[in-house]
């Protein structure tokens, strides 16, 4: 979907070295003849052409970022990942795996889209500041560089990251100003 595509594009632009995208039929790559135009666009951002299922692609993976459906990621799959994996289970209202289950399976950092768990990843972290910055600085088009700068500004608000605080809360009073400042 649109969220997954945007995440992949920005991770690639930021320099992520090994991105694998997976849909209901498995890893997306040039080996697939069933890709629609939206999925074909992803090929330019993927650093690999790994084939296989979600299960195959998770073996020894460091990070899982999901924007799909509740329950997709099981504790057993987390246990096949690298030691201390990072899990961003962003499906709403129910994430791909619940934080307690991910942690029990060995995840070091867990983020969801929900405000009732630590590390809420939500567009409310970025949009108010992006719009404030665009208005204040007369920016007519939000670019990928603006999005990366906003992500960096958010990250800098957490001076001493912990497993339960890798990103500020959307309710942190500094968020809007920090993001707005970098939209120029």
Predicted regions and their residues:
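Adenosine-phosphate binding glycine-rich loop
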Residues: 89-184
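Rossmann-like adenosine-cofactor binding region
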Residues: 40-108, 115-116
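Glycine-rich phosphate/diphosphate-binding loop of Rossmann-like nucleotide-binding domains
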Residues: 1-66
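A sequence-level detector of short, solvent-exposed, charge-rich linear segments
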Residues: 22, 38, 76-77, 83, ...
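Hydrophobic alpha-helical scaffolding
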Residues: 1, 10, 44-54, 63, ...
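Short glycine/serine/threonine-rich phosphate/pyrophosphate-binding segments
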Residues: 1-9, 29-30, 71-76, 95-97, ...
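Alpha-helical scaffold segments in soluble metabolic enzymes
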Residues: 6-10, 56, 60-63, 76, ...
């Amino acid at each position: 979907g649109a969220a997954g595509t945007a995440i992949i594009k920005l991770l690639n632009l930021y320099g992520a070295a090994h991105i694998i995208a997976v849909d209901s039929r498995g890893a997306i790559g040039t080996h697939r003849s069933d890709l629609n135009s939206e999925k074909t666009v992803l090929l330019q951002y993927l650093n690999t052409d790994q084939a296989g299922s979600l299960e195959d692609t998770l073996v020894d993976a460091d990070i899982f970022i999901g924007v799909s459906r509740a329950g997709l990621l099981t504790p057993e799959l987390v246990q096949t990942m690298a030691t201390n994996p990072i899990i961003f289970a962003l499906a709403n209202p129910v994430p791909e795996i619940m934080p307690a289950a991910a942690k029990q399976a060995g995840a070091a950092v867990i983020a969801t889209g929900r405000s009732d768990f630590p590390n809420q990843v939500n567009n409310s972290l970025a949009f108010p500041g992006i719009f404030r910055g665009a208005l204040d600085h007369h920016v007519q088009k939000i670019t990928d560089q603006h999005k990366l700068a906003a992500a960096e500004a958010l990250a800098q608000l957490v001076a001493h990251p912990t497993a339960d605080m890798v990103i500020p809360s959307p309710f942190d009073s500094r968020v809007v100003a920090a993001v707005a400042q970098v939209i120029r």
